[in-house]
Amino acid sequence: ANGIRVMAGFIIGFDGEKDGAGLRIVDFVTRTGIPAAMMGMLQALPQTALWHRLEKEGRLIQDESAAKGVNQTNLLNFKPTRPIRDIANEYVEAFCTLYEPNAYMDRVYSYYLKMGAPRWKGTSKLPTWTDVKALSIVIWRQGLKRDTRGRFWRYLFGMARQNPAMLEQFIVVLAHNEHF
């Protein structure tokens, strides 16, 4: 785990997918301690094998021009094999569970405690104004404003004591959660 930051992406909405896919994703991410787990709903991209199969089956609900670019204007762009409401509910529930502040902090803390110190040492430099602003935002939101502030400070000081070489990265990854 030295120098590698694990990230994982999960897609929900496949044909043949059984109920509970979202919970299985949450369970996997929790058991493995992956700090950054991205979730998405399946989209059929134009001119792919999936697109052609769904087109042949009459299941596409979006034409090719609408399917280009950002695929975040609808849940799925095809008719799934199980109810779309179930898929959407599982997606939202899984996402909210993964990024619930306590669960997210627990995963990030556990992960960075296990990380070894980087072998390559960069040259030390003073933080930029952007770095100072970002740190201030994290401290304000996570260390003062939220009800998770006790956990934040416990984990921050724990990381500083037990794995100081990873403290900066720990804070950076905690900050990533600020856009959710």
Label each PLM-derived region with a short phrase.
Residues 1-135, 142-143:
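A structural motif corresponding to the C-terminal lobe/cap of the Radical SAM core domain
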Residues 132-180:
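Terminal or standalone catalytic/regulatory effector modules within metabolic enzymes
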